[in-house]
Amino acid sequence: MWNLAGKELSSRLLLGTACYPSLEHMQQAIHNSGTEVITISIKRQTSAGLDGESFWQAVKKLDCHLLPNTAGCRNAEAAINTAEIARELFNTHWIKLEVIGDDYNLQPEPFELIKAARILIDRGFEVFPYCTDDLVLCQKLVDAGCKILMPWGAPIGSGKGLINPYALETLRYRFPDITLIIDAGIGKPSHAVQVMELGFDGVLLNTAVALANHPALMATAFRHAVIAGHQAFIGGMMSERNVAHPSTPLIDTPFWHQVNNL
């Protein structure tokens, strides 16, 4: 179990709800993933599934904690207004804060992000800021009152994995008491393992599951990957060596010669 913003959870995998082929695929993937937290955008237009249920009706059946986001916002004012609407609509003070500054790589706008985070925290929100792995930006967000950081592994939807493991490892070292969750860029289960082996608290992903050939099966794979990576970190991985080291100790006399000499 671990604590995320006051909620006791067993799964360290957070999953998005966009881009699935159908509501049925989304529901099955979320079920298979074992996640207890799903992200949703209030700017999403509701759509009917194969069985005629709306997106919102389908979400209610999942019995997960909701993490609304401010996707599509370009400045602090828009993000703050969206967060207030989300709090009213979903009855939660959680908000995944996204303020995008570039259309090419969907990189966060750092100045507006910090501004929005500070105001929202003052208004009683638990802010989950989507940010880059920049150490100074993350420090400013912590100074603003953020108890959670969600740095990217790579640009949203790129599937490139961890493009700067050193920067992420540095964040873990510098912020030992901050909840760190990788958000964006994860493309395959091995990336999730790598994240958790660095000591991160969780992984948030969407596209890697939603656009897989078999979303439900991929969700299962990510479920096990996150568990494996976390257990590897807790178990204490051996250090790398520059030279070989035999796993079986050698002695001068083979054991069968020793037996014959008895």
Swiss-Prot record:
Lineage top rank: taxon: Bacteria
Pathway stated in the Swiss-Prot or TrEMBL entry: Cofactor biosynthesis; thiamine diphosphate biosynthesis
Molecular function terms, GO-annotated: thiazole synthase activity
Subunit structure: Homotetramer. Forms heterodimers with either ThiH or ThiS.
Organism per entry: Legionella pneumophila (strain Corby)
Active site: K96
Annotated 1-deoxy-D-xylulose 5-phosphate binding sites: G157, A184, G185, N206, T207
Record keywords, A-Z: Cytoplasm, Schiff base, Thiamine biosynthesis, Transferase
Places the protein is found: Cytoplasm
Its EC number(s): 2.8.1.10
Cellular component aspect of the GO annotation: cytoplasm
Keyword Transferase among UniProt keywords: yes
PANTHER family hit by this protein: THIAZOLE SYNTHASE
Gene designation: thiG
The family this protein is said to belong to: Belongs to the ThiG family.
Any single GO BP term: thiamine diphosphate biosynthetic process
InterPro entries xrefs: Aldolase_TIM, Thiazole_synthase_ThiG, ThiG
Task performed by this protein: Catalyzes the rearrangement of 1-deoxy-D-xylulose 5-phosphate (DXP) to produce the thiazole phosphate moiety of thiamine. Sulfur is provided by the thiocarboxylate moiety of the carrier protein ThiS. In vitro, sulfur can be provided by H(2)S.
Protein known as: Thiazole synthase
